[in-house]
């Protein structure tokens, strides 16, 4: 399969690009230049690998979920344990790389957006490590849902700005973070948390997250002597999925499944299933599939999981959907909760609500596969942050 994206202008087919005001164009170009240089620089790669190993705790295990496998009665189920990274999710793979870039570019300050708070915590963590000033924008609804992560960020020395505009969720936090970056561009680096935003952000985040798929490939081959037949990951903006899928894109014998949040159901207004129900538009500097109405107004996204309720999806996922290399599905709040409880009870692993969407889809897929086939789930994060809201949810039900 001939797959080489993005092109030199940052496009993935028709998607991606750089839809930014003049005031940001210079910074985006400066970042692209610095990133290209860093990728060619052996010392940078060495330093990045050093921190990934000794600070983040990579490589993460590929765990054979024997009890889940028996329960499903089909394919062998493996979990890529991104929940075991420092800070409890895949997010730090990207923030550590981008913080090293910021230092390399001589920036003193970092700004970021966060939904569930995981990216905020991972950003505040690396800022503490490298002595960078840190400002995090978070929607006020998410601040309410994720009080613990807000406190964590403040403990780490970050300033958390609550955003009341719009729906008070991730989209609004991104708006404010971009605004802040425009006015502080000389000394500030924006650490985008997903494969979103203007080029080169989707590429940078994908490349830093690709460590997930590279390790998985190597580990699975060592265990089974072949590649897995299927790989499943959840999708909000899409960074854990892109990191898992990208190293497998050319291996056409490996089926790739992306799982979005169907919320209360894709037939309702309360979902975040952008690739299932969305249409093409531009948001936050990039062309991609979006949840929007006929006038092009962005619609609210809903999910029980704070990390999946973004009304867009990365440009590369948009392309992978169109060319049919990845098949995208959606899982409801209810199904994700059931999967959350099942994995916890069967394996003693409490997954993040985001990752539970991938687990839920894998539970449907595994029984349709043969016993000698393998299915890998990207367990993108741990569920400690969700236990309180799940307790509330179960009490209400």
Swiss-Prot record:
Keyword rRNA processing carried by entry: no
GO cellular component: cytoplasm
Residues forming coiled coils: none
Pathway: Amino-acid biosynthesis; L-tryptophan biosynthesis; L-tryptophan from chorismate: step 5/5
Enzyme Commission code: 4.2.1.20
Taxonomic superkingdom: Bacteria
Top class in the EC scheme: lyase
Catalytic activity reported: (1S,2R)-1-C-(indol-3-yl)glycerol 3-phosphate + L-serine = D-glyceraldehyde 3-phosphate + L-tryptophan + H2O
Keyword annotations from UniProtKB, A to Z: Amino-acid biosynthesis, Aromatic amino acid biosynthesis, Lyase, Pyridoxal phosphate, Tryptophan biosynthesis
Keyword ATP-binding applies: no
Name of one Pfam family that matches: PALP
Residues the record lists as N6-(pyridoxal phosphate)lysine modifications: 91
An example Gene Ontology molecular-function term: tryptophan synthase activity
Task of the protein: The beta subunit is responsible for the synthesis of L-tryptophan from indole and L-serine.
Family per similarity comment: Belongs to the TrpB family.
Subunit comment: Tetramer of two alpha and two beta chains.
Protein name: Tryptophan synthase beta chain
């Amino acid at each position: 399969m001939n797959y080489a994206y993005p092109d030199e202008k940052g496009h993935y087919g028709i998607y991606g690009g750089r839809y930014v005001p003049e005031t940001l164009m210079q910074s985006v170009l400066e970042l692209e230049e610095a990133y290209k240089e860093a990728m060619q620089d052996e010392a940078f790669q060495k330093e990045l690998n050093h921190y990934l190993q000794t600070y983040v705790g990579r490589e993460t295990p590929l765990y054979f979920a024997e009890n889940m496998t028996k329960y499903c009665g089909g394919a062998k189920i493996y979990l890529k344990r991104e929940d075991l990274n420092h800070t409890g999710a895949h997010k730090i793979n990207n923030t550590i790389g981008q913080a090293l870039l910021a230092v390399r570019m001589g920036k003193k300050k970092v700004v970021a957006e966060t939904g569930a708070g995981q990216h905020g915590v991972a950003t505040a963590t690396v800022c503490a490590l490298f002595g960078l000033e840190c400002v995090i924008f978070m929607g006020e609804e998410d601040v309410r849902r994720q009080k613990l992560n807000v406190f964590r960020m403040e403990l780490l020395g970050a300033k958390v700005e609550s955003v009341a505009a719009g729906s008070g969720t991730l989209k609004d936090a991104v708006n404010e973070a971009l605004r802040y970056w425009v006015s502080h561009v000389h000394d500030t680096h924006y650490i985008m948390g997903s494969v979103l935003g203007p080029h080169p952000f989707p590429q940078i985040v994908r490349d830093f997250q690709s460590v997930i798929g590279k390790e998985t490939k190597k580990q699975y081959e060592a265990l089974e002597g072949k590649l897995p037949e299927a790989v499943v990951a959840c999708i909000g903006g899409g960074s854990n999925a892109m990191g898992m899928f990208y190293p497998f894109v050319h291996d056409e014998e490996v089926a790739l499944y992306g799982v979005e949040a169907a919320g209360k159901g894709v037939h309702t207004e309360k979902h975040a299933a952008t690739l299932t129900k969305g249409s093409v538009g531009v948001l936050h500097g990039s062309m991609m599939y979006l949840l929007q109405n006929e006038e092009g107004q962005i619609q609210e996204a809903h999910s029980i999981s704070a990390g999946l309720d973004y009304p867009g999806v990365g440009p590369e996922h948009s392309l992978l959907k169109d060319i049919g290399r990845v098949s995208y599905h959606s899982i409801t709040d209810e199904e994700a909760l059931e999967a959350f409880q099942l994995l916890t009870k069967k394996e003693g692993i409490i997954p993040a609500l985001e990752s539970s969407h991938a687990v839920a889809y894998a539970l449907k897929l595994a029984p349709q596969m043969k016993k000698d086939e393998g299915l890998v789930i990207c367990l993108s994060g741990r569920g400690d942050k969700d236990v309180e809201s799940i307790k509330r949810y179960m009490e209400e039900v």
